[in-house]
C-alpha cells in the first residue's frame, strides 16, 4: 500500500511551479502598495521630542550653573565722543605742523576722556556698595593698576639691573686699585729697612 499511495502523489521538484510563482507575484504586487507605509514606519524612528525635553531638560533643573562675579577688565572701549577723535587722527596726515602743535598744546592740560568717564561710572557703582565693599573695591583696583602697569615695572627693572652692574664695576675697580696699592707697598718694603717698614705700617694705620 505504501507503493500505491506514493504513485498517486505527484512528485515535487525543487523548482517552483509556474502557477505558484504567478500567484505569488500577484499577491506581492498588492502587498507593496499596502506595505510601503509599513516598511517606512519600520525603518524610520519617530521621536517624541516633548517627552525628551521633559525628561532630559526639565524646567526646574539648574545644570550646576552659577553666577561668577568678576571685576571688569582694564579695557577702555571707545565711546561716541572718541569716534570723532579717530576721524581727527585720520586727517592729521594732511594737517599742517603748526596747527597740530597748537592742538597738542591745548590738549596737554586735559585729562583723557576715558579716565573722566571711568571716574563718573565708578561713582555711580559705588553708591550701591557699603563702605567696607567700597574700600575693598578701591584696594583691588589699586592693586590691579599696579599689576597691569608693566611698562613702569620694566623701566624699574632696567634701572635696578644697570645700578647693580654699575655697583659691580665699582667693586671690581676698588679691588683692582686695592691690589695695586698693596703690591706697591710690598715692593717698597722689600727695598727698605725694617725700621722703614714699621714706619709705613704706622702711617697706613
Curated annotation (Swiss-Prot):
Residues 121-130, 167-179 have a biased composition (Acidic residues). The modification N-acetylalanine is found at residue 2. The modification Phosphothreonine is found at residues 89, 92. One of its GO terms (molecular function) is protein phosphatase inhibitor activity. Residues 147-150 are annotated as: Required for binding PPP1CC catalytic center, displacing metal ions and inhibition of PPP1CC catalytic activity. It comes from the Eukaryota. Residues 17-26, 182-205 have a biased composition (Polar residues). Pfam families: IPP-2. The modification Phosphoserine is found at residues 44, 121-122, 127, 130. Residues 31-44, 131-142 have a biased composition (Basic and acidic residues). Only detected in spermatozoa, both heads and tails. Belongs to the protein phosphatase inhibitor 2 family. Inhibitor of protein-phosphatase 1. Interacts with PPP1CC. This is Protein phosphatase inhibitor 2 family member B. It comes from Homo sapiens. The gene is PPP1R2B.
